[in-house]
């Protein structure tokens, strides 16, 4: 009797090995239902703290809690078989000390079943990245426009548009790579700088509003599907589901009011008497 082989999940070493090779494909995911649809087509899924804005209507990601990330991370892991799953560490869960970061990252790994966590920041959190990786927790880094620091940055501003900013951002990239991160997200960054960083470090770069020369790309799923009312410049909508959802809701409302739904085929009949 043949036994169907289980689908093998993408691993951290496989992501690292894609440096300079076939581009790495990624999207965000926040719950099991949509994760099932996109799982076969991506290399990793990011359960991003952007869920605070996308799913909960928050103005920023700062209000997202560790418990929220764990709940959504677990849902995405349950809904996937193939993609490596990375979960964001939310604001306030890792900055205080490497020890606290490790404690919280352990919770994320244990309670979600994900493979890795993502931390925002460069040189300032390199010590924490090193501390986690030495203790068996894979870390994806995130530099450039870091949404958890928008209060300091003064908003969602593209980074590196002036050459005077390049040295600090390049130092961030080198610091996280040397600390042991297996990949780094480059967000909201001038294209020439993102391309330059990609050539400078030996770990994959994942671009979002960065450069086509990055080793991979990521988008927020809802942006890619056309569900965001004001998508950023770097977003390409591969579908227009927002308009389709509105159209479907309008058609449903009309059918209910006209009493054409539910029709006979949508109702249950009595059992025939014996």
Curated annotation (Swiss-Prot):
What's the superkingdom here?
Bacteria
Indicate where this protein is primarily found. Answer: cytoplasm
Protein residues bound to Mg(2+): 49, 88, 120
Q: Where does 3-methyl-2-oxobutanoate bind?
A: 49-50, 88, 118
Cofactor requirements of the protein: Mg(2+)
Q: Name one Pfam family in it.
A: Pantoate_transf
Q: Where does it reside?
A: Cytoplasm
Q: Name one GO biological process term.
A: pantothenate biosynthetic process
Subunit structure comment from the entry: Homodecamer; pentamer of dimers.
Per its database record, what is this protein's job?
Catalyzes the reversible reaction in which hydroxymethyl group from 5,10-methylenetetrahydrofolate is transferred onto alpha-ketoisovalerate to form ketopantoate.
Full protein name: 3-methyl-2-oxobutanoate hydroxymethyltransferase
Q: Which organism is it from?
A: Parvibaculum lavamentivorans (strain DS-1 / DSM 13023 / NCIMB 13966)
């Amino acid at each position: 009797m043949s036994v169907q082989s289980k689908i093998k999940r993408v691993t951290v070493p496989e992501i690292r090995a894609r440096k300079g090779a076939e581009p790495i494909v990624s999207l965000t995911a926040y719950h099991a239902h949509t994760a099932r649809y996109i799982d076969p087509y991506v290399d990793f899924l990011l359960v991003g703290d952007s869920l605070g804005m996308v799913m909960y209507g928050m103005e920023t990601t700062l209000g997202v809690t560790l418990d929220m990330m764990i709940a959504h991370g677990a849902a995405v892991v349950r809904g996937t078989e193939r993609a490596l799953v990375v979960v964001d560490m939310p604001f306030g869960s890792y900055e205080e000390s490497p020890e606290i970061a490790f404690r919280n990252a352990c919770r994320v790994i244990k309670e979600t079943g994900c493979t890795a966590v993502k931390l925002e920041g460069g040189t300032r959190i390199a010590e924490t990245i090193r501390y986690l990786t030495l203790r068996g927790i894979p870390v994806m880094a995130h530099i450039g426009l870091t949404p958890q620091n928008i209060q300091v940055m003064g908003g969602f501003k593209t980074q590196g548009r002036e050459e005077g900013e390049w040295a600090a951002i390049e130092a961030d990239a080198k610091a996280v790579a040397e600390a042991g991160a297996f990949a780094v997200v480059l967000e909201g960054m001038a294209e020439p700088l993102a391309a330059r960083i990609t050539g400078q470090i030996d770990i994959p770069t994942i671009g979002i509003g960065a450069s086509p020369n990055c080793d991979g790309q990521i988008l927020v799923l809802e942006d890619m599907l056309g569900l965001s009312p004001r998508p950023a410049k770097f977003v390409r909508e591969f579908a227009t589901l927002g308009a389709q959802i509105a159209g479907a809701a309008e058609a449903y409302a009309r059918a209910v009011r006209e009493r054409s739904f539910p029709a006979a085929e949508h109702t249950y009949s009595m059992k025939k008497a014996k």
